[in-house]
């Protein structure tokens, strides 16, 4: 039976960078590309970070009972939904997976697939450094959404509260102060669980 290694962390904790590097270092990993109804950001590609769909397609997939889990956020830019679908991507009898997502989606996938399949990789960064990284990233956008950045920053404090981390069974944290050190620790954790 395969494993799902699940990367999660607050906004601007370095999840996307770590995810991309792990996919390069461990090519046997398959990915589970999540879906979202939010607009594509500068530099993103459909089918890589996310499948970008509209609300109508989300509703169709819900009616077809293909949605494993979903979360909707009332953002400064409208309601954005993120979800994981049973769309044929997941073949645990053959493959191991590397996934990136939220603590809520991790918990839902753990409920769906079981503890023995899910391996949490929680990336943590001190809030001041994280806010600085988020601001730098937002400034690089063609149309920066600073209000949304602030909303996400505050929501992350609640989403990744100690209570929620405990409820999800997340015991280990990977500090992403120095990316190389963080990557080494994550690679060790992956090797122990393969």
Language-model-detected regions and their locations in the chain:
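Small-molecule kinase domains that catalyze NTP-dependent phosphoryl transfer to phosphate-bearing small molecules
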Residues: 139-190
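Short beta-strand-centered segment that lines the nucleotide-binding/catalytic pocket of NTP-utilizing
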Residues: 28-41
């Amino acid at each position: 039976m395969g494993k799902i290694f699940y990367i999660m962390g607050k906004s601007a904790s370095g999840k996307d960078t770590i995810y991309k590097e792990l996919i390069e270092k461990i090519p046997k990993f398959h990915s589970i590309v999540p879906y979202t109804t939010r607009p594509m950001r500068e530099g993103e590609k459909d089918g890589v970070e996310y499948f970008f769909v509209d609300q109508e397609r989300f509703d169709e997939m819900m009616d077809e009972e293909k949605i494993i889990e979903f979360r909707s956020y009332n953002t400064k830019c409208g309601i954005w939904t993120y979800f994981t679908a049973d769309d044929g991507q997941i073949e645990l009898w053959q493959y191991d997976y590397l996934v990136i997502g939220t603590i809520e989606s991790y918990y839902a996938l753990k409920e769906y697939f079981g503890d023995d399949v899910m391996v949490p990789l929680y990336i943590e960064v001190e809030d001041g450094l994280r806010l600085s990284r988020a601001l730098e990233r937002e400034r690089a956008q063609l149309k920066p959404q600073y209000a949304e950045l602030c909303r996400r920053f505050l929501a992350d404090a609640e989403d990744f509260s100690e209570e929620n981390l405990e409820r999800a069974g997340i015991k280990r944290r990977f500090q992403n102060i120095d990316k190389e050190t963080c990557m080494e620790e994550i690679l060790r954790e992956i090797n122990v669980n393969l």
